[in-house]
Amino acid sequence: GMQHKYNETVLFFPSQGQTCHAYCTFCFRWPQFVGMDEMKFAMKEGEALSQYVTEHPEVSDILFTGGDPMIMKASLFGAYIDKLLDADVPNLKTIRIGTKALSYWPYKVLTDKDAEETLDTFRRITDKGIHLSIMAHFNHLVEMKTGSVKAAIKKMRETGAQIRTQSPLLTHINDDANMWAQMWQKQVELGCVPYYMFVVRDTGAQHYFGVPLVRAHQIFKTAIEQVSGLARTVRGPSMSATPGKVQIDG
């Protein structure tokens, strides 16, 4: 289905992308993975999406999310994209794809049978003059150190896509300012753009991972002071809430 939460951005939940590479208990879309069908977003056809964007000229961005749209076969994902591209919507400027594929299955664009087809879909977007932003989810610096992740990032960037990173702040996993500083620096080194530090929302079985907001702000402040301006594109600590994104400034 669709969610028009922000004036300029429509969230799109393709029905075939409502599972994920991982089942994180801190995920704020936990209901989608535990059998609560009435809370799932689903849509079988892409026509409604292109029609909606056409009828709402204020919309410039579409975020493909889930679940994870990158668990879909390239042919299925490409069909959604082609519906949008064929509609030639003048107000559509950016397509975003929220995914954990880089950290959990970089082979999606390396060795999967349809890896090149996936990359071709990315190229069709950028060749159309539409900005493509891969919203890559990483939880820790170590996820960025493997050769396969580095190769996948390179492949994606060669299509003209830009990779922006977003990460949740998690007790027992990454609640360390030095790690965050190193992770942002590594992301810049690999050609990615640090984008968000998230705090976990009050959904699902996330209580084990939650970090108090005061400490979250301290971690962010200490980390941001250790990096150059190129990594200070990151925003946080942030939370997606009913009014939109809420950021703690102090």
Task: Outline where the language-model segments fall.
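Conserved alpha-helical substructure of the radical SAM core
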Residues: 9, 30-62, 72, 76-79
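Local cysteine-cluster metal-coordination motifs and their immediate loop/turn environment
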Residues: 13-31
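Conserved AdoMet/S-adenosylmethionine-binding subsite of the radical SAM
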Residues: 47-54, 70-209, 214-215, 219-227
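Residue-level recognition of the N-termini of beta-strands and the immediately preceding loop/turn
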Residues: 60-62, 92-95, 130-132, 233-237
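C-terminal accessory regions of radical SAM enzymes
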Residues: 218-250
